[in-house]
Amino acid sequence: MTIIGIDLGTTFSCVAVHENSKPQTIFNSNGRNTTPSIIAYPNDGDVLIGESAKDAVIPQGQIIYDVKRFIGRQWNDISVQNDLESWAFRVIDNDGKPYIKVSQNNCETLTSPEQASSEVLKFLKQSAESYLNETVNEVVMTVPANFDQRQKAATMEAARLAGLKVVKLISEPAAAAVAYEMKNNSRKTILVYDFGGGTFDVAIAKSTGLGNLEILSSSGHKHLGGQDIDQLLMRYAISEYNQKGSKKFPEHNWRVMKRLRDACIKAKITLSTNNKSTQIISEINDDYDECVNVQLTQDKFNKLCDDLFKGTLDIVDQALKLANMEATNIDHVLLVGGSTKIPRVKELMRDKFGNEKLVCRINPDEAIACGAAIVAYHIQSGTEVPMELQLQDIIHLSIGCELRGGLFHKVINRGEKFPLQKTLHLGTVVDNQHIGNLPIYEGERLQTKYNVKIGEVTLNFDNQTIKRGHNLKAKFEIDENGTLSVSVIDEETRRHIQYHQKYDGSGQRDINIEKIVAEAEANRADDQRFETLIRLRESYEDSVHIKKDEINRSNISPVKKAMAIRVVEKYLNWSKQLPDHNSEFKEMLKKFQDEVKIYTS
């Protein structure tokens, strides 16, 4: 049974298969090898995908797009809140998750991003089945390099809903590098510049010339792509219209906004074919007697978007820094994604790396799906990680758990290669503990409140009578897909403790990964002070608990024992609030010892 490769993009998606010794994209029922990532819900109860959804003559609230920008995210994520105004369809808060409110045939239903994405995947699956004349159940899928754990899990869930088992999940720039490497089979260092419709990724890969491809570094932005260029052009066109006429542009009218967006996309494409000027022409009303007509030259286009374009170079520099490289160390630069067709983008990359290093012969719209298809072919050949194609990718943010007091303990460090497995030894906090939670975080700060919660493991001790400090071992595992699993083992009974892991944490802050790292570096002193206080509190509380155990085992009278335990609880309660100075723990411990001695002597 054939395993296919799918690039599920923000604006366009693509499916490919490896046959006759090479990868090739599969044409859909509309005769195109890329499919717009658009879903429409007309009133007849049907579901339309791609071109037919884009052209559907139905209210815009029934046409869904941009799903990749909020799949696996939380309602209060910054990017979700910022994007709400730009979407013609309704997105609402459903138990902390962004859900799409779809009105179809006078009935309103809630659709998750995973469900919406699964419709696109079903369409691609059907296209592949029609081409191959067989049932397809397995897929290699690609995701942006800096997708977090929740976004990866949600993408895999979308595939499951579409009837597809994800046999491997790889980063988009890694897939592009695979597509190039299998054609050239050379010992080179490759930089992949992946500028798509909704996300931007950079990866640096080293090839041995034997099919072995190692990802040295990667960086990116989850919310930077061609659609952001479209928004800049729309804002410019609206501003020009408002300045020239007495009327204000009707931004509240979704029909008019759709026409303007389509006109801006058309102008962007025209200027991407080396034309020096074009016009943004868009009708204002349904009578077509009033319109926006804005002249847009190549120079003006570059000026409007230059900060955005140059911002991608900052991310390129971050990837180079992570790999401990300079631009001169790069042998080839792969331009991938539809936005790399823009002349100014090519010019900036040419200026940075030199014209001779730019690889433009690889199809930017198809490269990622083709790379996924190559990986699929090698997996299908019978070896999960075949010798001919070794892919090693890296962890982009450290992963760990929250310890007592809100201290973040890194288990898997940023920059480590996966698959990998790490263990952490833990202990219960109180006597006779029956249940507990182990929050899982991603981030670089020592204070968990500044990191991002990605899940939680619930520990159930089955009503065991256990003492404080009961030994546990947590196993953190990142599989070949870059997805995380956590299990906990009772080291004394050697049995797995029942656990439940869910991706339900706080909102993801939409900032560059390198900025997260820079914040951690800038706040290192504050974090170290916090860690010192937490460690001192742990030592203080351990001393108080040891004394509590001694009191409980002692032969003093019940009255004295009760009074002594009351003193213990008073000093434990004091430690719940962190003091300002380290010395306070020493002072309070001395006071505790003196006060409790009154009842235990």
Model-found features: residue ranges?
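Oxyanion-binding/catalytic loops of NTP- or PPi-dependent enzymes
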Residues: M1-N82, W87-N94, K101-E119, Q126-S601
